[in-house]
């Protein structure tokens, strides 16, 4: 049970529908095929008497998540670059798009929890992205033409990515 001291502190919990909806939408994207329903019994539709309700579902998971994040930007490539692999028994999923902007927008998750401060999975992703794109540029002799040293920051301009480790 709840002690009297706790009930004095936690008299009434107010839930913000927008915050809950945002998190449940995020979880649906992170778990393709999972259907999540949210019903707010505090808000009644005057026309039909129903409660405010929303269903979150994503067939394509991270691919759709990146498209959702990118919906207001101009894309360099319309296709989502998608990787799904397992390393040392740990599933990892990555979805990437590039836009015409200059900033990097990377969302990383471990076990469906947003790792806002990054982590080794994010650092590893950035290193691998830089190494892979730099090798491609060198192999295709693109760097000889520009005569400029390219850094990891250059490859991350306009990048939107979602990384999920489970």
Predicted regions and their residues:
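Single conserved hydrophobic/aromatic residue that forms the stacking wall/gate
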Residues: 1-6, 10
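Outer-membrane beta-barrel proteins
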Residues: 12-14
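GHKL/Histidine-kinase-like ATPase module
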Residues: 18, 26-27, 33, 37-166
């Amino acid at each position: 049970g709840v002690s009297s001291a706790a009930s004095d502190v936690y008299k009434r919990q107010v839930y913000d529908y927008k915050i809950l909806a945002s998190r449940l939408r995020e979880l649906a994207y992170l778990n393709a095929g999972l259907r999540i329903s949210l019903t707010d019994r505090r808000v009644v539709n005057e026309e039909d008497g129903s409660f405010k309700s929303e269903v979150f579902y994503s067939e394509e998971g991270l691919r759709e998540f990146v498209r959702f994040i990118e919906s207001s930007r101009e894309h360099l490539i319309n296709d989502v670059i998608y990787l799904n692999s397992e390393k040392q028994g740990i599933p990892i999923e990555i979805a990437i798009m590039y836009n015409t902007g200059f900033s990097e927008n990377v969302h990383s998750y471990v076990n469906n929890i947003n790792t806002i401060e990054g982590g080794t999975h994010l650092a590893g992703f950035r290193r691998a992205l830089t190494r892979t794109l730099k090798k491609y540029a060198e192999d295709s002799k693109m760097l000889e033409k520009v005569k400029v040293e390219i850094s990891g920051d250059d490859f991350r301009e306009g990048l939107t990515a979602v990384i999920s480790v489970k």
